[in-house]
């Protein structure tokens, strides 16, 4: 038991050398936020404006151009401005990035936009407008 204590103490003393290395932090790639299965509901004037869902959100707020990255895709549902629950359009993509300073979104990979067409003030959907793309920008 005494021998084990001496060996342990010797190991501890010799393992604490002066090989301290400094690590340089690259703020452009330093993740400051990570969230899984995030859902955000945006309200304007008491009315639901949109619901945003992402399986993974990673934020880089210390970068020169701060951004949020959605590497596992996004799903966005917008609502008509005159209703609490009437869906207006949906956007889905495999990947997205949001540049905070420019307030600019970029979606990539199997981007699908589906817009529900209605006559003004009506709740009946008269048709759908579908757009398929590999990339979409909006602000």
Model region roles, listed by residue range:
Residues 12-15:
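C-terminal motif of bacterial Sec signal peptides marking the signal peptidase cleavage site
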Residues 1-3:
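Bacterial N-terminal signal peptides that target proteins for export
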Residues 17-139:
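Structural signature for solvent-exposed beta-strand/loop edge elements and short helix-capping sites
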Residues 6-7:
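Terminal module of membrane-associated proteins
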